[in-house]
């Protein structure tokens, strides 16, 4: 179940892997556990967070990346996170396959 997503990280995650999390500002406990588990497995974390995610932010290490939407409306946070994800995918595509946007 989604409340136990950290179990998948513990089972499948390998050192050097990347965990990407999305939170709309509510710092759900399953994501807290997933980040802790990822760090226990020597994984990196990219956290797409909202203004209320101070618990998640505190867990991120110096090697992790936080892309924070400084807003309190969960719908607006999700919308901006989705746009950010599309931009990130476009940049990765350009790095892998070249070309111009």
Place the predicted regions along the sequence by residue:
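Glycine-rich phosphate-binding loops that contact phosphosugars or nucleotide phosphates
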Residues: 1-98
């Amino acid at each position: 179940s989604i409340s136990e997503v950290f179990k998948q990280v513990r089972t499948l995650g390998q050192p050097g892997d990347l965990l990407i999390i999305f939170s709309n500002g509510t710092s759900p406990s399953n994501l807290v556990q997933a980040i802790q588990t990822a760090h226990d497995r020597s994984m990196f974390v990219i956290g797409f967070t909202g203004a209320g995610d101070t618990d998640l932010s505190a867990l991120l290490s110096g090697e992790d990346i936080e892309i924070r939407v400084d807003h309190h409306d969960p719908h607006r946070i999700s919308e901006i996170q989705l746009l950010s994800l599309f931009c990130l995918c476009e940049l990765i595509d350009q790095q892998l396959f070249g070309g111009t946007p």
